[in-house]
Amino acid sequence: MVKTTLVIMAAGIGSRFGGGIKQLTPVGPSGEIIMDYSIYDAIEAGFDEVVFIIRHDLEKDFKEIIGNRIEKVIPVKYAFQELDDLPEGYERPAERTKPWGTGQAVLAAKELVEHPFAVINADDYYGKEAFVKLHDYLVADAGKKTDGYDICMAGF
C-alpha cells in the first residue's frame, strides 16, 4: 500500500486579514478551524500523515490549537519556513521581510516528505471530493513511473 502525505502551508502572515492568525481562527460551531475540516477529509480519503509548514513564532499557538490534537489521530511533522532558507546560489535581499511564498514553503518541507504528497493552503476549504481525487491520483500506478517524475496540479 502506498503511503501519502498531506502538506499544509500554514506559515502565511495574513497581512490583509485584519488581526489575529488567519489560519488558526475558529470558523466552526465548536471552534473548529478550516484545517480541522481539511485534515478530517484527507484522513477519510486515505492520507497517512500530515506535514505542517509553519513559522517558528506560530509554533506554540499552532500546537496548542491544532497540532497536539491532530497528532493523536495521524502522524504529524513540522517544517519551518525561514526567510533565509533558499536554494544554493540565491540570497535574500536586505530589504526583504516577508516570506517568499508557495515554492519556498514547499522546499522547507523537502526533508520531511518521504511519500507521494499533496500541498494545500491552511486557510482554504477544499471539500472531501477534492481529497479523494488527490489521494487516488497519488496512489494510482505508484512505482510505475519511468522518468522519475510524476507531477500534477489540481485547482479547486
Regions found by a protein language model. Give the residues of each.
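N-terminal glycine-rich phosphate-binding loop and ensuing alpha1 helix
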Residues: 2-67, 76
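Short, glycine/charged-enriched secondary-structure capping and boundary segments
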Residues: 21-23, 65-68, 93, 132-136
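Short helix C-cap/helix-to-loop transition motifs enriched in small/turn-promoting residues
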Residues: 71-73
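Conserved beta-loop-beta/alpha segment of the NTase-like Rossmann-fold superfamily
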Residues: 81-156
